[in-house]
Amino acid sequence: MEGEHVLICVAWPYANGPLHLGHVAGCYLPPDIQYRFERAMGNKVLMVSGSDEHGTPITVTAETQGITPQQVVDQYHAINKEALIALGCGWANTLDGRGPEYGGALFNRTSDGEHKRMVQENFSALEVGGFFERKTTEQYYEVNSDGTGRFLPDRYVEGTCPVCAAEGARGDQCDACGATYEAVELKDPVSKMNPSARIEIRETDHLFYRLDLFQKVLEQHANSQQGIWKSNVKSMTKNWLDMGLQPRAVTRDLEWGIPVPLDGDDWSGKCVYVWFE
């Protein structure tokens, strides 16, 4: 009997620091066990993961260390891949020893040219299909004493969570309570990299993914999985759907990342939001 085709999708951690035991226990050891089991069963299995090399986690680390974002991701991609292989995870052999038709274990990078092509291709298709809407939003903007400045997306701004009042919340989410919100809802905002800088609110245009268009179909899918999903997954999904899905921004005022594949000066200096990527 010919083996089944199995795809194992593993989380992609940011390449902004060394992995720790939590990464191994939480997202690398379980899929590696599954990978070995599927191979032992004679299945054709492909396990895919790699380094998430874009977004503010990378640029903030680069600015803190005084090096370029490329140097950050090159350094930690190599360190983390070598560490996983040293632990005995199956990333050493990209192709299965039985032959390429049996799959293998691919530990890739989001800086890979093929990844960029696919992201921009799918982004453009969604835009043409009418799944994006353009909005003028208000964002925090850092103004320096010499008159220069920049927008403060995601980890570039910290403050007090508007939901649970925890300090140290970021511009896109609060790690304490898990809430997501618009950046300007953050209270007592401070620039992460330049705390003494004056912060003001400025307008900037972004594209938003129309998640609300999928409300009904996702409710139907969630209902069909009640006997399959774990209780925490079911409750979390129900909470999101009960609140009503809202459009989410898929672009950022940031140059490190995959450029927005649209014509016009309005999109110059903007990239695809790393979570959407």
Task: Label every PLM stretch briefly.
Residues M1-S49, R117-M118, C164, Q173, ...:
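Structured secondary-structure scaffolds
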Residues F37, F107, F123, F131-F132, ...:
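Phenylalanine-focused residue identity feature
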